[in-house]
């Protein structure tokens, strides 16, 4: 699908005044998503109650996310956040009789926070080597005593993409379950949980999924679900809502009433993404990022990209005062996402090559003259 930005930019009013390149943190808000949020308000303001409509919207969002990742709807749970998803997963593993968990030093900090709170597990960290995680590291650190391996699909700091299918093969061979944090990939990199052999995968909606905070999705492979008994479960995770039996498949990981306003937003956002097609989005983002990498190098900027990434969807530029630089850019209506000592430019399907170059020009002007 050619000319993606031209087709869809009018859906994003912010683009008329701002250069929005922070999809790794918060994407631009699309008018269909804004209308969905307003629909939620209006349903309460003018109808007084909206329970049936909200439940229908929840199921629609579940179906759209399942379509996005190649899953069945019953394999998807609606949860408040990726952190909540992992907390629930961590509480569900007792039946496996193993107490060793591994995660990587590229995981978002919420992942180690969860496992630090579970003193009954022995935890190991898989270290990266020169900014990459070779498959040999997984071979070394996953053992037959490992109950769960946690990995990010995309590194939040520099956009490094991992080969999840290859990691899944290693974890399965060693008898470990695999949990994938897809918050930084869902919406701009195609995901196929069945083809990859993933056991569990979670993603929130405020980044590349075009939504707002308050809702996330947890995929659980249906053949696995019955063996998982989450202690973090409540009435939305029960078969009827009012008895003690776990719901079938992934729904058992649900807790209370979801944030319906965020569900409305997610339903509209996911529908838009599925209409466009993530493979088209991937191709567009990859093209403009490749141009931006070359342009940044020409401008004398130092890139933080790791060697060996599969398909770049982010341009990370080194800057020891990244937050300060990002603040200066914000004054010029260029919105990017600083993290530690890098400035992240994270485009989406609505961005152009010219916007990426404009942001790089502004970064070069700020960093070179500091």
Curated annotation (Swiss-Prot):
Q: Which cysteines are joined by disulfide bonds?
A: none
Q: Which residues carry this modification: N6-(pyridoxal phosphate)lysine?
A: 207
Question: Transferase: present as a keyword of the record?
Answer: yes
Key words of the record:
Aminotransferase, Pyridoxal phosphate, Transferase
Superkingdom, taxonomy of origin: Bacteria
Could you tell me which SUPFAM superfamilies the record lists for this protein? PLP-dependent transferases
Query: What InterPro entries would the database entry show?
Result: Aminotrans_V_dom (IPR000192), Aminotrans_V_PyrdxlP_BS (IPR020578), PyrdxlP-dep_Trfase (IPR015424), PyrdxlP-dep_Trfase_major (IPR015421), PyrdxlP-dep_Trfase_small (IPR015422)
Q: What are its cofactors?
A: pyridoxal 5'-phosphate
Q: Please state the Enzyme Commission number of this protein.
A: 2.6.1.-
GO MF annotations in UniProt = transaminase activity
Its family?
A: Belongs to the class-V pyridoxal-phosphate-dependent aminotransferase family.
What protein name does the entry list?
A: Uncharacterized aminotransferase YcbU
The species this protein belongs to is: Bacillus subtilis (strain 168)
């Amino acid at each position: 699908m050619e000319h993606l930005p031209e087709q869809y930019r009018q859906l994003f009013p912010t683009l008329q005044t701002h250069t929005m390149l922070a999809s790794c943190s918060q994407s631009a808000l699309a008018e269909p998503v804004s209308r969905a949020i307003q629909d939620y308000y209006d349903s309460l303001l003018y109808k007084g109650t909206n329970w049936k409509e909200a439940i229908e919207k929840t199921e629609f969002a579940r179906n759209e996310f399942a379509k996005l990742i190649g899953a069945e709807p019953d394999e998807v749970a609606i949860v408040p956040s990726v952190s909540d998803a992992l907390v629930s997963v961590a509480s569900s593993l007792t039946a496996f009789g193993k107490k060793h968990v591994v995660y990587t030093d590229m995981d978002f900090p919420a992942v180690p926070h969860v496992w630090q709170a579970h003193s009954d597990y022995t935890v190991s960290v898989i270290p990266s080597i020169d900014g990459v995680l070779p498959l040999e590291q997984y071979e070394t650190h996953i053992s037959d005593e490992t109950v769960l391996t946690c990995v990010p699909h995309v590194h939040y700091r520099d956009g490094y993409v991992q080969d999840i299918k290859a990691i899944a093969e290693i974890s399965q061979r060693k008898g470990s379950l695999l949990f994938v944090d897809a918050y930084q990939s869902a919406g701009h990199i195609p995901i196929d949980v069945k083809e990859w052999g993933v056991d569990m995968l979670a993603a929130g909606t405020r980044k590349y999924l075009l939504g707002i905070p308050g809702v996330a999705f947890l995929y659980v492979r249906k053949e696995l679900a019955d063996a998982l008994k989450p202690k973090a479960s409540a009435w939305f995770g029960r078969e009827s809502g009012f008895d003690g039996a776990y719901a079938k498949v992934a729904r058992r990981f649900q807790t209370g009433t979801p944030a319906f306003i965020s569900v409305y937003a997610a339903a509209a956002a996911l529908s838009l993404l599925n209409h466009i097609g993530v493979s088209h989005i991937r191709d567009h983002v990859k093209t403009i990022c490749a141009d931006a990498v070359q342009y940044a190098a020409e401008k004398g900027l130092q890139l933080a990209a790791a060697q060996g990434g599969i398909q770049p969807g982010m341009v990370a530029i080194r800057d020891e005062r990244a937050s300060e630089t990002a603040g200066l850019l914000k004054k010029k209506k260029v919105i990017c996402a600083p993290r530690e000592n890098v400035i992240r430019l994270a485009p989406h399907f609505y961005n152009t090559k010219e916007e990426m170059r404009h942001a790089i020009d502004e970064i070069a002007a700020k960093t070179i003259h500091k």
